[in-house]
Every structure is written in C-alpha cells, then in structure tokens.
Amino acid sequence: MDGDRSKRDSYWSTSPGGSTTKLVSDSERSGKVDTWLLILAFTQWALSIATVIICIVIAARQGYSMERYSMTVEALNTSNKEVKESLTSLIRQEVITRAVNIQSSVQTGIPVLLNKNSRDVIQLIEKSCNRQELTQLCDSTIAVHHAEGIAPLEPHSFWRCPAGEPYLSSDPEVSLLPGPSLLSGSTTISGCVRLPSLSIGEAIYAYSSNLITQGCADIGKSYQVLQLGYISLNSDMFPDLNPVVSHTYDINDNRKSCSVVATGTRGYQLCSMPTVDERTDYSSDGIEDLVLDILDLKGRTKSHRYSNSEIDLDHPFSALYPSVGSGIATEGSLIFLGYGGLTTPLQGDTKCRIQGCQQVSQDTCNEALKITWLGGKQVVSVLIQVNDYLSERPRIRVTTVPITQNYLGAEGRLLKLGDQVYIYTRSSGWHSQLQIGVLDVSHPLTISWTPHEALSRPGNEDCNWYNTCPKECISGVYTDAYPLSPDAANVATVTLYANTSRVNPTIMYSNTTNIINMLRIKDVKLEAAYTTTSCITHFGKGYCFHIIEINQKSLNTLQPMLFKTSIPKLCKAES
C-alpha cells in the first residue's frame, strides 16, 4: 500500500515534461477568496455612497424646481386675476354704455320714428282713400275676417249628405257650447238693453242693441251701440263672436228699432229717431226721421238723416220703423225689412184662414189689419231699400209688401243665403204660428210662406199660442227662426214656450210638424223677451248663435245673453 502511495505522490509531483510542480495548499486558496470578497464589499459600499449622494443632489435640484414652479404658478394666477378684473371692468363699462343707448332708443328714438312712420302711412292711405277708384283698396287695409272655414249657413249647401237624406235628430239632446260672451251691457242697475240685432256677413258680423239708462220703456232716451267683429274658434274649437270695434251713438239722438247689415268691411245700421211715442206717431201724418249709420273697422263712422220728405215712399205713411231684425246687401243696395201704418188703407184680400173657424170671412181677415190701438191704421210690412249706399248721400226708397202676400205687418228679418232671400215676420196678429218663407224681390213682389204647425209664440188670451182663427189683435213677441233647409221647413229658433206669458225660453230645432230637439235655458218661470238666432258652418259642421233678452228678475231689467249650440243634423242611410 505504501509503495502505491509513493508512486502516486511521485506522479503528482512531476510534470509530464519532467519538471517539478509545486502544489497550492488550502490555506493559500482561502486567503485569496477573502481578498476578493473585501474588494467586492468595498465596491458595493462605494456605489451605495455614490447613489445616496446622487439622490441628495437630485432631490435638492427638484426642491429648487418645485419652488420655482410654485412661484411661477402664483405669478400666473396674479396676472390672470389682473387680466380678468381688467376685462370685467371693460365689459361692464361697454354693457352699461350700450344698455343706456338701447334704453334711450326704446323709450325715445324708436317711438318717435314709429309715430312718424305711422303718421306718414296714415296720411298716405287717407290721401289715397279720398280717390273714388281706390275705395275698395283702402277698405282692405285692415285684414279682419272670420276664421278659415267659417261662413253663414247656406241651406242649399248645408242640407245635403254624401249619402242618404239629411234630417234633424232628437238624440243626443242639444247642449250649450262653452265660450265667452262680449255683448254690450249696461253700467247702471236699472239700465235696460233691448232689441238685439245680428247680421253675419262673409267677412265680419255686425251687432246692435239699444241701451235705455232707466227702465225699459220704448220712448225712454237711449244709447245705440253698434259692434263689428269676426267669428273665431276658441280652444274647444267652437265658434265665438269677437268684437273688433264698437261705437256708441249719442243718447240725445234717441235711436230706436234699429236693423243692421254686415257687408264687406263695414256695418250699416238703419234706425228710427222718434220724438213721440208709438201711438201718437200712428195718429199723425208722416213718419219720424230715419237715420243710416255706417261704421268701419277703423272706428270711423258716418250718419245720414232722412226726413219724411227725403224718402221715396210708394204710399203715404203715418208711421214707419225698421223691423229690428237684420237686413241684406244686394248689388248696389241694402234692403231692410220695415213695418208701419198707412195713412190710407190698401184694397185687396190679405192672407186668411176660414176653414174650421166660426163666423169668419175674408172681410174679417182684411179688417184685422186695421189695429184700433194704433188709431185704426192698416199695418203693413215694407222693404226699405238704401240705394247707392257707398255714395256720399245714399237714397232711400220704400216699397210696400202687398197685403195679398202677407199677414199683419210687424217686426221681422231678411236673410240672403245663396241665391235666395228668406223673410221672417213676427206673429203679431191672429196668425200665431211661425211666419217664415222665401221672398222674391222682383216685380211683382211675392212671398212663399212655409206653413209651420209646431212652432208658435205666447200672446194675449184672444191670440195665444194655439190661436189660428182670424180676429183683430196685436200681440206676440219677436222670436225669429233661421232656415236650415232650402224650403225653410227645418229651422233653428228660440221660442218662449208658453201660452200667454213671456217665459220659458227654449232653444228648438224643428220641422213643419214636430219639435225634434230642444233645450230649456233654465226653467218654465224664467222671464224673457226678444230672441234672435243666426247660424254658421265651419267646414260643413253647423252651429247656431242664440241671443235672448233675459229678465234679470232681481233687478227687473232685460239684458241680452248669448248662447251657442251645435245643429243636430244627421244623414239617414239609404236602405
């Protein structure tokens, strides 16, 4: 074993080249490692110190930058504040300056310029309107017109159906339509407003009423109020009367029994100007003065007064009055219905009914036209024709309705609807039933009355609701009707539905034999007087305005009130 170890030691101690190799001991190797570890540790320490120094330097520099940044931001804020304050001050000064200028212009400059321009335009228009050929142009300077689709109801157009036959329906019952009423009233407790007259033209309407300041006596001094306006639709899409201009005529002129016509952009009013009471007037020869008033939409008014000698009368009259209800406009003339007493009675046979009446003859009917209470004068209806009504001085001609065509002369109304003229007269005599028909104004003048059995009016005991036999009497009340069908067989009206008393005003839609649909205004005891009904269409749908003199019983005075209904027309399907 020892020999082998000596051989092994000899091998490791000699190099292959034969030189001797010195072996490194374990202690020597350990010393070198420690040296390198020491060097590495020192290097790490040095790097750490350098890193700390670098961080300190960087931090110092950053602190300086932050301080400079803060100072810069503060300086910018200060500068921004100064600029803001400067701009605000400048803007405030500019705004104040401009506001002062605007205020000055609005309060002073613009009104002055507008007034000047308005005066210039008005002067130019008035200068132009003085020329005859520009009259129509000047009339149209104010654009006032009914709402689109609204027109006076024309029976030939209304009373038809796309299929089937038209008829008045009882279901549902008519009801009052909501909306305002702007009819003129009184400012005194005892004031009385009478004789409403309404005319609806193609563009505007005219409404007139008589205001007596104390009580309701006809001869009492009174104002006459004439309104012009147009028909609009309210928020419920129902029609309303909207007055545009109103004129009140002097109380000292004492206009009475006025009738109106609306045509173009003007309203025309024909009135009597009595100086005595009615009975005294009938007992004397000649008539009281008439006056024609003209009002336009600018509020300008003109009046023409006519004495008995200035009127072309076809017969001598002791009394003559416009008929309260509306008149009509035709080519170049206005026509008002009137009534009055002839100085000398006409000869001929009047409208009469003998069948079913005891001890009655034609003479009974003829004599019934001569009213004892009015001095025995024969009371007739007339047409009052105002010719050349656009001229400086219109002319008036009076034509008597032949007694052969008429009942007792009385208040009434004319309507021109389409090509036909309709006439209504108050049933003041023995004939109590509704008097409405078609008037032919050509020569000879004729009336085709439509017999109505269902509608009548209250009257005195001898001539009450049911009376149909001839006798002398003067009674009744003005309750006109509006024709819905071309033959005036179907009508809209407000009747005082009572036998002898002026009570129970009731809106009625009726044909010749039956009351189809009706609405009582309040109750059977409500007192009323004159009523007038006018109807329109809105794109074919029919509506009626009803104006009723209602007795304000707590004040014992009359005041017209406006009501509106929808026409209950339906179409019967063909079988």
UniProtKB/Swiss-Prot annotation:
Stretches in topological domain Intravirion: 1-37
Basic and acidic residues bias (residue ranges): 1-10
Chain segments carrying region Disordered: 1-25
Enzyme class: hydrolase
Pfam families referenced in this protein's UniProt entry, alphabetically: HN
GO BP of this protein: symbiont entry into host cell; virion attachment to host cell
Intrachain disulfide bonds: C192-C216, C258-C271, C357-C469, C463-C473, C535-C544
Entry PTM: N-glycosylated; glycans consist of a mixture of high mannose-type oligosaccharides and of complex-type oligosaccharides.
GO MF annotation terms: exo-alpha-sialidase activity; host cell surface receptor binding
Coiled coil stretches, renumbered: none
EC number in record: 3.2.1.18
Subcellular location, principal: virion
Residue ranges, annotated region (Involved in interaction with F protein): 59-140
Region span, Involved in neuraminidase activity: 254-259
Glycosylation site list: N77, N499, N511
Subcellular location: Virion membrane; Host cell membrane
Domain of life from the UniProt record: Viruses
Membrane topology, record value: Single-pass type II membrane protein
Substitution effect: E461G: In strain: Isolate E30cl2; egg passage attenuated
Skewed-composition ranges (Polar residues): 11-24
InterPro entries from the UniProt entry: Hemagglutn-neuramid, Hemagglutn/HN, Sialidase_sf
GO cellular component, one term: host cell plasma membrane
UniProt free text on domains: The C-terminus (head domain) is involved in binding the cellular receptor.
Subunit-level organization: Homotetramer; composed of disulfide-linked homodimers. Interacts with F protein trimer.
Function: Attaches the virus to sialic acid-containing cell receptors and thereby initiating infection. Binding of HN protein to the receptor induces a conformational change that allows the F protein to trigger virion/cell membranes fusion. Neuraminidase activity ensures the efficient spread of the virus by dissociating the mature virions from the neuraminic acid containing glycoproteins.
Protein name: Hemagglutinin-neuraminidase
Organism this protein belongs to: Sendai virus (strain Hamamatsu) (SeV)
Annotated gene: HN
